[in-house]
């Protein structure tokens, strides 16, 4: 993988760890993430004059896949919040971030993108580590342990993450091609921000519509957590914009998804040593294996 992609993903991983740690400490219902994504929309409206010529040339295929990525991101944030409400950051986050590798790698095979043997070995290690972080002792292999509500919510969030990763790689390629065809192409550094902005607007509205089922939660979130939700919005937008930029340097999106797992180790460390979550050998070994 090209070194620019490595640098971009490492910076993104630190930002990702930060916003998930903040979200875990707050009320992470749909209202919280609706506010955070809404802040992203507001902050980057000034980009639209530069992006609009590109947006108007995007084909119908782009918009079809775009609907799928918004749905996938909605599922990701909704179920991630559910997982954080009943589970530990150091357990929910690794599951939500690692399982998408299986889906993305499988889809890559379907489209003729064959990962190298070292890459496949890395995928297997990440999945093994994901099982370990859920265990309290190495001798504990109870199926019930892996079917707790927090773990199930994390799995559903992982499905959303896999879905939008695949869709976003497809759409970023379309945007790059459309951009080169323009008489005055948009700066390549701005294209990922444009795409992320396009996603954030309908995503915020969708999450807000879900949150409307409980108006009291919306008021409580606005009163108690609006500042932290805004910070999460900035970090979320910046972190994923860096990932989208990194995708431009790789041919196989599974490499990007896999390398992002460095954030798993960071988040487990934060969960244990800063949030006071349960510390045990399998969890630490699992995080190291995934790293």
Regions found by a protein language model. Give the residues of each.
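Membrane-interface interhelical linkers
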Residues: 1-68, 77-87, 128, 135-155, ...
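Hydrophobic side-chain positions within alpha-helical transmembrane segments
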Residues: 18, 22, 79, 106-110, ...
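C-terminal appended segment following the main domain
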Residues: 8, 236-291
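Short, well-ordered amphipathic alpha-helices
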Residues: 169-174, 271
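Hydrophobic transmembrane alpha-helices of multi-pass small-molecule transport proteins
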Residues: 44, 105-106, 117-137, 282-291
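Specific alpha-helical transmembrane segments that line the substrate/conduction pathway
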Residues: 68-73, 84-130, 197-201, 252-273
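Transmembrane helical elements of multi-pass membrane transporters/channels
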Residues: 157-169
């Amino acid at each position: 993988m090209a070194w620019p992609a490595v640098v971009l993903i490492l910076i993104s991983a630190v930002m990702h760890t930060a916003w998930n740690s903040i979200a875990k400490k707050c009320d992470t219902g749909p209202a919280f993430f609706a506010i955070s994504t809404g802040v992203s929309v507001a902050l980057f409206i000034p980009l639209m004059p530069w992006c609009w010529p590109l947006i108007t040339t995007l084909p119908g295929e782009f918009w079809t896949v775009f609907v799928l990525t918004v749905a996938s991101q909605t599922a990701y944030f909704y179920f991630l919040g559910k997982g954080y409400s009943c589970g530990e950051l150091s357990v929910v986050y690794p599951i939500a971030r690692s399982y998408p590798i299986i889906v993305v790698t499988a889809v890559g095979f379907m489209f003729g993108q064959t990962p190298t043997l070292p890459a496949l070995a890395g995928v297997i290690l990440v999945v093994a580590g994901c099982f370990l972080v859920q265990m309290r002792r190495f001798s504990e292999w109870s199926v019930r342990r892996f079917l707790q509500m927090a773990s199930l919510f994390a799995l559903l969030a992982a499905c959303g993450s896999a879905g939008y990763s695949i869709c976003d790689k497809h759409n970023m390629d379309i945007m790059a091609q459309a951009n080169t065809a323009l008489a005055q192409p948009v700066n390549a550094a701005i294209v990922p921000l444009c795409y992320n902005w396009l996603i954030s607007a309908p995503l915020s509205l969708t999450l807000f519509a879900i949150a409307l089922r409980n108006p009291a939660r919306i008021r409580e979130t606005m009163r108690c957590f609006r500042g932290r939700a805004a910070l999460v919005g900035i970090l979320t937008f910046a972190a994923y914009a860096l990932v989208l930029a990194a995708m431009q340097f790789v041919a196989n999106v599974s490499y990007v998804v896999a390398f992002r797992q460095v954030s798993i180790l960071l988040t487990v460390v934060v969960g244990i040593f800063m949030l006071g979550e349960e510390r045990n050998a399998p969890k630490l070994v699992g995080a190291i294996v995934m790293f």
